[in-house]
Protein backbone atom coordinates (compact mmCIF):
# COMPACT_ATOMS: atom_id res chain seq x y z
CA UNK A 1 0.00 0.00 0.00
CA UNK A 2 1.30 3.45 -0.85
CA UNK A 3 0.20 6.06 1.66
CA UNK A 4 -0.18 9.72 0.91
CA UNK A 5 0.00 12.55 3.38
CA UNK A 6 1.13 12.41 6.98
CA UNK A 7 0.07 10.42 10.01
CA UNK A 8 -2.50 12.29 12.06
CA UNK A 9 -0.16 12.16 15.06
CA UNK A 10 2.35 14.24 13.08
CA UNK A 11 -0.09 17.07 12.36
CA UNK A 12 -0.31 20.12 14.60
CA UNK A 13 -4.10 20.25 14.40
CA UNK A 14 -6.52 17.36 13.87
CA UNK A 15 -9.82 18.42 12.33
CA UNK A 16 -13.11 16.56 12.10
CA UNK A 17 -14.95 16.36 8.76
CA UNK A 18 -17.38 18.87 10.25
CA UNK A 19 -14.92 20.87 12.34
CA UNK A 20 -16.90 23.35 14.44
CA UNK A 21 -16.48 27.08 13.90
CA UNK A 22 -18.73 29.46 15.84
CA UNK A 23 -19.02 33.19 16.36
CA UNK A 24 -19.25 34.66 19.83
CA UNK A 25 -22.62 36.04 20.87
CA UNK A 26 -20.88 37.98 23.63
CA UNK A 27 -17.74 39.37 22.00
CA UNK A 28 -17.93 41.00 18.54
CA UNK A 29 -15.19 39.93 16.14
CA UNK A 30 -14.50 36.76 18.13
CA UNK A 31 -14.76 33.30 16.59
CA UNK A 32 -13.88 29.85 17.93
CA UNK A 33 -12.69 26.92 15.83
CA UNK A 34 -12.10 23.38 17.07
CA UNK A 35 -9.53 20.75 16.13
CA UNK A 36 -8.40 18.50 18.99
CA UNK A 37 -8.22 21.76 20.92
CA UNK A 38 -10.02 25.10 20.75
CA UNK A 39 -8.66 28.06 18.80
CA UNK A 40 -9.88 31.65 19.15
CA UNK A 41 -9.59 34.79 17.08
CA UNK A 42 -10.56 38.21 18.39
CA UNK A 43 -9.79 40.07 15.17
CA UNK A 44 -12.13 38.36 12.69
CA UNK A 45 -9.62 35.64 11.80
CA UNK A 46 -6.45 37.65 11.22
CA UNK A 47 -4.69 35.94 14.14
CA UNK A 48 -5.56 32.82 16.14
CA UNK A 49 -4.57 31.55 19.59
CA UNK A 50 -4.99 28.20 21.34
CA UNK A 51 -7.32 28.48 24.34
CA UNK A 52 -7.31 24.85 25.47
CA UNK A 53 -5.11 21.80 25.67
CA UNK A 54 -6.05 18.66 23.74
CA UNK A 55 -9.63 17.96 24.89
CA UNK A 56 -9.82 14.42 23.45
CA UNK A 57 -8.56 11.03 24.65
CA UNK A 58 -5.42 11.57 22.49
CA UNK A 59 -5.04 7.88 21.61
CA UNK A 60 -1.79 7.59 19.67
CA UNK A 61 -2.69 4.18 18.24
CA UNK A 62 -5.65 5.74 16.43
CA UNK A 63 -3.71 8.65 14.93
CA UNK A 64 -1.94 6.94 12.05
CA UNK A 65 -2.73 6.97 8.35
CA UNK A 66 -6.30 7.91 7.48
CA UNK A 67 -8.57 6.08 5.06
CA UNK A 68 -6.95 2.64 5.31
CA UNK A 69 -7.05 -0.16 4.51
CA UNK A 70 -8.81 0.75 1.25
CA UNK A 71 -7.73 4.22 0.24
CA UNK A 72 -5.94 7.12 1.82
CA UNK A 73 -7.32 10.32 0.40
CA UNK A 74 -4.90 12.37 2.53
CA UNK A 75 -7.37 15.22 2.78
CA UNK A 76 -6.62 15.82 6.45
CA UNK A 77 -10.15 15.17 7.68
CA UNK A 78 -9.94 11.41 8.25
CA UNK A 79 -8.82 11.97 11.81
CA UNK A 80 -9.96 10.52 15.12
CA UNK A 81 -9.57 12.29 18.41
CA UNK A 82 -11.16 15.56 17.33
CA UNK A 83 -13.70 17.95 18.77
CA UNK A 84 -16.98 17.25 17.02
CA UNK A 85 -19.09 19.90 18.74
CA UNK A 86 -18.31 23.31 20.22
CA UNK A 87 -20.83 25.59 21.89
CA UNK A 88 -20.68 28.98 23.57
CA UNK A 89 -23.32 29.48 26.25
CA UNK A 90 -26.01 31.87 25.04
CA UNK A 91 -26.34 33.12 28.63
CA UNK A 92 -22.80 33.65 29.88
CA UNK A 93 -19.64 35.03 28.32
CA UNK A 94 -16.60 32.77 28.69
CA UNK A 95 -18.57 29.54 29.01
CA UNK A 96 -17.65 27.07 26.26
CA UNK A 97 -18.53 23.38 26.08
CA UNK A 98 -16.98 20.78 23.77
CA UNK A 99 -17.87 17.24 22.77
CA UNK A 100 -15.34 14.98 21.07
CA UNK A 101 -15.62 12.18 18.54
CA UNK A 102 -14.08 9.86 21.15
CA UNK A 103 -16.66 10.57 23.85
CA UNK A 104 -15.42 13.36 26.12
CA UNK A 105 -17.33 16.46 27.23
CA UNK A 106 -15.41 19.47 28.61
CA UNK A 107 -16.37 22.91 29.92
CA UNK A 108 -14.60 26.18 30.60
CA UNK A 109 -16.26 28.98 32.53
CA UNK A 110 -13.39 31.43 32.13
CA UNK A 111 -12.85 31.74 28.40
CA UNK A 112 -10.43 28.83 28.15
CA UNK A 113 -8.07 29.55 31.05
CA UNK A 114 -9.03 26.21 32.61
CA UNK A 115 -11.12 23.25 31.43
CA UNK A 116 -13.04 20.62 33.37
CA UNK A 117 -13.92 17.10 32.22
CA UNK A 118 -17.70 16.81 32.68
CA UNK A 119 -18.18 13.58 30.72
CA UNK A 120 -21.09 11.56 32.16
CA UNK A 121 -19.79 8.81 34.46
CA UNK A 122 -19.75 5.47 32.69
CA UNK A 123 -20.14 6.94 29.20
CA UNK A 124 -18.29 4.63 26.85
CA UNK A 125 -16.20 5.84 23.94
CA UNK A 126 -18.66 7.39 21.50
CA UNK A 127 -19.30 10.31 19.17
CA UNK A 128 -20.70 13.37 20.93
CA UNK A 129 -22.96 14.60 18.15
CA UNK A 130 -24.46 17.63 19.87
CA UNK A 131 -24.14 19.80 22.96
CA UNK A 132 -26.88 22.28 23.84
CA UNK A 133 -27.51 24.67 26.71
CA UNK A 134 -31.10 25.19 27.78
CA UNK A 135 -32.54 28.52 26.64
CA UNK A 136 -34.21 28.71 30.07
CA UNK A 137 -31.39 27.83 32.47
CA UNK A 138 -27.65 28.43 31.97
CA UNK A 139 -26.66 25.41 34.09
CA UNK A 140 -28.78 22.91 32.11
CA UNK A 141 -26.84 21.08 29.38
CA UNK A 142 -27.99 18.39 26.96
CA UNK A 143 -25.79 16.05 24.91
CA UNK A 144 -26.66 13.61 22.12
CA UNK A 145 -24.23 10.73 21.62
CA UNK A 146 -23.95 7.69 19.38
CA UNK A 147 -21.86 4.51 19.31
CA UNK A 148 -22.72 3.49 15.75
CA UNK A 149 -18.99 3.09 14.97
CA UNK A 150 -18.99 0.29 17.54
CA UNK A 151 -22.12 -1.37 16.05
CA UNK A 152 -24.15 -0.17 19.03
CA UNK A 153 -27.32 1.58 17.84
CA UNK A 154 -28.71 2.44 21.26
CA UNK A 155 -29.82 6.09 21.36
CA UNK A 156 -28.13 8.05 24.13
CA UNK A 157 -29.26 11.52 25.19
CA UNK A 158 -28.19 12.99 28.52
CA UNK A 159 -29.23 15.97 30.64
CA UNK A 160 -27.36 17.82 33.36
CA UNK A 161 -28.87 20.55 35.54
CA UNK A 162 -25.61 21.51 37.27
CA UNK A 163 -23.10 22.42 34.55
CA UNK A 164 -22.22 18.76 33.99
CA UNK A 165 -21.41 17.72 37.56
CA UNK A 166 -24.08 15.00 37.28
CA UNK A 167 -25.99 13.57 34.32
CA UNK A 168 -29.20 11.63 33.69
CA UNK A 169 -29.78 9.46 30.63
CA UNK A 170 -33.09 10.73 29.21
CA UNK A 171 -33.31 8.35 26.24
CA UNK A 172 -36.20 6.27 27.57
CA UNK A 173 -38.88 5.81 24.91
CA UNK A 174 -36.56 6.34 21.96
CA UNK A 175 -36.38 3.06 20.03
CA UNK A 176 -33.21 1.07 19.43
CA UNK A 177 -31.73 2.09 16.10
CA UNK A 178 -32.93 5.69 16.27
CA UNK A 179 -29.88 7.83 15.56
CA UNK A 180 -29.04 10.33 18.31
CA UNK A 181 -28.03 13.29 16.15
CA UNK A 182 -29.18 16.31 18.12
CA UNK A 183 -31.24 17.38 21.12
CA UNK A 184 -32.70 20.85 21.64
CA UNK A 185 -35.05 22.41 24.15
CA UNK A 186 -37.90 24.55 22.90
CA UNK A 187 -37.24 28.26 23.36
CA UNK A 188 -40.81 28.93 24.54
CA UNK A 189 -41.85 25.79 26.43
CA UNK A 190 -39.36 24.71 29.08
CA UNK A 191 -38.77 20.95 29.12
CA UNK A 192 -40.07 20.33 25.59
CA UNK A 193 -37.25 18.61 23.72
CA UNK A 194 -36.70 17.96 20.03
Language-model segment annotations:
Residues 1-194:
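Beta-propeller blade termini and top-face loops
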Amino acid sequence: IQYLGRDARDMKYLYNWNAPIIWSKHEPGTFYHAAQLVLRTRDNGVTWEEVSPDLTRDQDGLQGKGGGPYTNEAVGAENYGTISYLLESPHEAGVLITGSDDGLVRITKNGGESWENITPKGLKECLVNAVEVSPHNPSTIYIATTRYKFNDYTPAIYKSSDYGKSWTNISEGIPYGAFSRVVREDEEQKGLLY
